[in-house]
């Protein structure tokens, strides 16, 4: 797809990953007996709007708020979802800005319900770079085409991949390649980058890809996929502060969830999945000290897991949509709430059973 070609949400590359399963998981709180008349769903990574469209079609009484930091994605999703009228609202923010977005709509007199009173009934965060961004060649996310080393999900943000390559010290560059890309040759690549940038600053992706081919040993290039994959992933995560955002958004999103509401995360690489797994584990376990024969009052978990381990796409879906192959899905629902305060839910979201 050319860089200036309008995005086609209906093309095969833009089929929402695990579409029906996301409808089922997010819908647990929407269809619960305690659900309000107009339940609210938050799509924290709106992208092209495929998952949001599925939610709006499946649950005719639901309202969906879509968040995205990319203004191009927001514009295309708004056009795609215009037919749903006042059932779809959008807001530009990094996904850990969910609280800011919900506060905004709480103050909006045109929003149909009181979010502070009602809370949200479900949310989805489909992490990583979107199919739309990968297919927009001038964004610099894809290593198979030559493009400016940008990689910003929000074009108004400052830091680019080129700036990282041209300004980071050796130790910091090696650290992000190792931590965010699990790159075994991080130190060697960092040395090569610093040596080459002294000749000429990095601007385009093809030069970086050539450097990686020249730096990574031939035996290592024959396994583990494209030799640029890990470095490009690491740069993208650093540019967009993806892991920091994820660590912040998990407690923030669950704090707005009403009783019986479900929260879902779709991860595409091990660092994301590890963060989600660890935080959900802590949220769904009792805080009673180990060794006591009974659970102490007030220490019972507020949430329970909806997935056993991490769910994956089916073999059939992977065959039809290769971008679903790495996905790992984890979900939890709120089963109780204690009084608002330190460490507690922001609002008294009590079931109406």
Curated annotation (Swiss-Prot):
Localization: Cytoplasm
Catalysis: reaction(s): cytidine(1402) in 16S rRNA + S-adenosyl-L-methionine = N(4)-methylcytidine(1402) in 16S rRNA + S-adenosyl-L-homocysteine + H(+)
Pfam families, A to Z: Methyltransf_5
Top-level EC class: transferase
GO biological process: rRNA base methylation
Main location: cytoplasm
Cellular-component GO terms for this entry: cytoplasm
E.C. code: 2.1.1.199
Keyword tags: Cytoplasm, Methyltransferase, rRNA processing, S-adenosyl-L-methionine, Transferase
Entry coiled-coil feature ranges: none
GO molecular function: rRNA (cytosine-N4-)-methyltransferase activity
Disulfide bonds: none
Gene3D superfamilies: Putative methyltransferase TM0872, insert domain, Vaccinia Virus protein VP39
Binding positions (S-adenosyl-L-methionine): 49-51, 68, 95, 126, 133
Function according to Swiss-Prot or TrEMBL: Specifically methylates the N4 position of cytidine in position 1402 (C1402) of 16S rRNA.
Family classification: Belongs to the methyltransferase superfamily. RsmH family.
Protein name: Ribosomal RNA small subunit methyltransferase H
């Amino acid at each position: 797809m050319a860089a200036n070609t309008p995005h086609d949400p209906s093309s095969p590359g833009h089929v929402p990953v695990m579409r029906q399963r996301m409808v089922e998981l997010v819908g647990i709180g929407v269809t619960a007996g305690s659900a309000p008349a107009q339940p609210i769903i938050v799509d924290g990574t709106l992208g092209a709007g495929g998952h949001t469209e599925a939610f709006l079609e499946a649950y005719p009484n639901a309202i969906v708020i879509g968040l995205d930091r990319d203004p191009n994605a927001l514009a295309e999703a708004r056009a795609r979802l215009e037919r749903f009228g006042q059932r779809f609202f959008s807001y530009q923010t990094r996904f850990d800005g969910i609280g800011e977005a919900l506060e905004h709509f709480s103050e909006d007199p045109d929003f149909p319900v009181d979010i502070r009173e009602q809370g949200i009934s479900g949310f989805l965060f489909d992490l990583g770079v979107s199919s739309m961004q990968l297919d927009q060649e001038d964004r610099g996310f894809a290593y198979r085409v030559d493009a400016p080393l940008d990689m910003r999900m929000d074009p108004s943000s400052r830091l680019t991949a080129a700036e990282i390559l041209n300004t980071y010290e050796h130790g910091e560059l090696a650290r992000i390649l190792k931590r965010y890309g699990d790159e075994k040759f991080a130190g060697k690549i960092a040395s090569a980058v610093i040596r080459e940038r002294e000749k000429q600053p990095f601007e385009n992706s093809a030069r970086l890809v050539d450097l990686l081919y020249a730096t990574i040993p031939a035996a290592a290039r024959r396994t583990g996929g494209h030799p640029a994959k890990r470095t490009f992933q690491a740069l993208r995560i650093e540019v967009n502060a993806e892991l920091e955002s994820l660590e912040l958004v998990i407690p923030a999103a669950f704090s707005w969830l009403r009783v019986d509401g479900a929260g879902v995360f779709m991860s595409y690489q091990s660092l994301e999945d590890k963060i989600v797994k660890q935080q959900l584990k802590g949220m769904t376990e009792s805080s009673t000290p180990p060794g006591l024969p009974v659970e102490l009052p007030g220490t019972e978990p507020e949430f329970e897991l909806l997935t056993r381990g991490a769910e994956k796409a089916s073999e059939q879906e992977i065959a039809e949509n290769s971008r679903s192959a790495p996905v790992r899905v984890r979900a939890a629902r709120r089963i109780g709430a204690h009084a608002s305060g330190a460490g507690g839910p922001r609002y008294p979201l009590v079931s109406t059973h």
